[in-house]
Amino acid sequence: MQIAVPKEIKNHEYRVALTPTGARELVGRGHTVTVQAGAGEGAGFADAAYEAAGARLEADVARVWEGAELILKVKEPQAEEVARLKAGQTLFTYLHLAAEETLTRGLMESGATCIAYETITDRQGGLPLLAPMSTVAGRMAIQAGAHSLEKAQGGAGVLLPGVPGVAPAKVAVIGGGVVGENAARMALGLGAEVTVLDKSIPRLETLDDRYQGRMKTVFSTADAIDEAVRECDLIVGAVLIPGAAAPKLITREMLAEMKPGSVLVDVAIDQGGCFETSRATTHTDPTYIVDGIVHYCVANMPGAVARTSTQALTNATLPFVIALADKGWQQALADDPHFLPGLNVHDGRVTYQAVADAFGLESVDPASLVK
């Protein structure tokens, strides 16, 4: 199969969809891998490393896309990339379509087959291709939040762990999944006072057992969120409804109850954000202030630590990439019921129910396309 790895073009996105090690695996199975020149440089992978792995280098971006049967990316395609997609091609990347109607319709118009990393499941009901980047984003959320609390960044001038004689900052994490646990773990490690809110009692029990009561666990209700809003210096939004838009859990009215200079970090921004006042930002201009509250809403947080993120991503995606390359998308998805939910768009039709519901579109059962 002809496999293409274009260079990411989203603002400050330095990750690449495939490491040289991954390219070597695919070439060894008889596939042709074409990597856009410079695609791996931001993650510390030189062109020469891809050549040594047997991949072809191509400087012309148009040629990278034109001859591809399978296109591997990291972030959702930007407008100029959507324009390059065509029927007969398979795109495998993070899509987060439920918050992006223009992108969804663009992919439909392309006629391509679009498979999303973030909606593939596993036997335990987890999201195996979202988990590694969620781990990175959760840990980075606390770094970003701690920095945003500095006075020069618009924050209250609070040091997360405090100092002897001065209380540490209070941190609330809304959502106790992979992002939430990693955010809470980082905040705890830095010495903050940490509360995790979640609607799953079994999940809260797991966190209680794992951290031996060193962080507070609270069943998430409107009242519990109100209390966090009033008391906390830093709130991390880590809520996920797989494939669907995130719920708005903190309204603009609630910002008035927060301490001036407090910080909101919205890790759910890829899915539209879980704060009413959230809007996507970039690594170039990561924060803004609404009603005295600092908002950090960078949509590709792991892109800032591209080498770690790229290695973790390839470790997770490579088995699925191999299946697509060896079998073609239909057989690969037919053989694996956990791979099947990854199909979001095919031949002009939406195949993931939550995306269809978000925009009032009809959804096609993906199982009907792979029989």
Regions found by a protein language model. Give the residues of each.
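Residue-level detector of alpha-helix initiation sites
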Residues: E76, V136, G177-V178
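Adenosine-phosphate binding glycine-rich loop
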Residues: E118-L159, I269, C274-K371
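Rossmann-like adenosine-cofactor binding region
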Residues: D209-D291
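An N-terminal-biased, well-structured beta-alpha scaffold segment characteristic
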Residues: Q2-G106, S110
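Short glycine-/small-residue-rich Rossmann-like dinucleotide-binding loops
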Residues: E69, K75-E76, L95-H96, T221, ...
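Glycine/serine-rich phosphate-binding loop and adjoining beta1-alpha1 elements at the start
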Residues: Q2, E8, A79-A169, V298-N300
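Glycine-rich phosphate/diphosphate-binding loop of Rossmann-like nucleotide-binding domains
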Residues: P6-F45, A152-L240, T287
